[in-house]
Amino acid sequence: MEQQLTLVLLDSPKGAKYVETFEEAASSSSSSSSSSVPSCTDHRHRTFVKFFLYFSLVALAYYFIISSLAVSPIPPTLPQSSPGNVSSAKCDLFTGDWIPDPTGPLYTNVTCRHIQDFQNCLLNGRPDVNYLFWRWKPRDCDLPRFSPSQFLASVKNKWWAFIGDSIARNHVQSLICILSQVEEVEEIYHDKEFRSKIWRFPSHNFTLSVIWSPFLLKSETSSNSDIQLYLDQLDHKWTVQYPKFDYVVISGGKWFLKTTIFHENNVVTGCHYCQGRNNLTDLGYDYSYRKTLNLLRDFVLNSTHKPLVLFRTTTPDHFENGEWNTGGYCNRTMPFKEGQANMKTVDDVMRDVELEVFQKFGKGFGLGSNIRLLDTTGMSLLRPDGHPGPYRHPNPFAGVKNKSNVQNDCLHWCLPGPIDSWNDVMVETTLNRERELYDLTG
């Protein structure tokens, strides 16, 4: 019996593949019969040796098979409570630690063709790979690893949508990379800018969308004017499609920090970061963000269509000694421990607004509600090592005398990378809601 497991770790910029191969082999051979007649003692001795070798080989084969399962992405069963552990339905999935995980990611930059160049850190020459070998572990329960085969089986004939900015796109690309290890996806639509897309997994009739809507609201912009933001109108681009969706992951983000002019009831009411132009009052980004999330929440709760809506919380960046346009960088290679990282003020403010709006009626809006909070902020804060940094482009330091002149990306995530764990908590949050509904209906 021979079994071989090949794990492709990465593709170097020069195209060289690094491969670790594990081989398991167990073989047995029939012993040839002797022409001489053995003595009774010899016979018993040979019989004992045969049995010893036989059971040793069986035990060895069993050990190797079990070992191979430990590094293979075998779909986990639905999580069960274990002695001394809290079931995930009662567990805070978002308070925990990053622990070493020698199994590594479910895909690589070689096995997934859907990684955007800016997030393809290994192909762009990032020299370290330690950031790939961690997984998120909640404090009080076990979190099953994402199973692409189980996920696809559960979403047959369903439609998932991700709505937001480039971080939403980053997230959906992570999900597609994982799922494409089971079934390759077909892109069936994209807009002119390739920002909004629709994919389909044909054998499961599963549809997956990403909708570019960085403000979630109606907005207008041109090259020579500030962004006009309508605080009382959601973006028609996603609301007209909303009745099609069975599951929605929606999020705000750093776009609210841009210079924006606020409109309410067809009247300009203020602005953010407008530096007093036109004598407008600077109401701040928290004002527009709060208005947006309240409008979003009311739309979801009042709609007759009831998909499961996961609101994903803000994503902190990890720029140090500057921002993206002032020489900021991120060169850490290990996760933070609890207490080592502090949220920046802008992220703190956005998170406070999110919790104010989405925890107003209690955790999860109460049993049976179709809104859940996908609170990835804390787990993301602990991963300064997971960003492209300078490796948003191939070989970023080639021919550069001053490395500080190389722009870093410390907001988006490498693929594969920490963002893959968002899918673990996303699926478990979805399952917990299904369990709640089952308990309510009996």
UniProtKB/Swiss-Prot annotation:
Protein's name in the database: Protein trichome birefringence-like 26
Organism field: Arabidopsis thaliana
Bilayer-crossing regions: 51-71
Organism domain of life: Eukaryota
GO molecular function, one term: O-acetyltransferase activity
Gene name linked to the record: TBL26
Motif stretch (GDS motif): 164-166
Cell compartments where the protein resides: Membrane
Its job: May be involved in the O-acetylation of mannan. May act as a bridging protein that binds pectin and other cell wall polysaccharides. Probably involved in maintaining esterification of pectins.
One term under GO cellular component: membrane
Chain positions of motif DCXHWCLPGXXDXWN motif: 409-423
Family as reported in the entry's similarity comment: Belongs to the PC-esterase family. TBL subfamily.
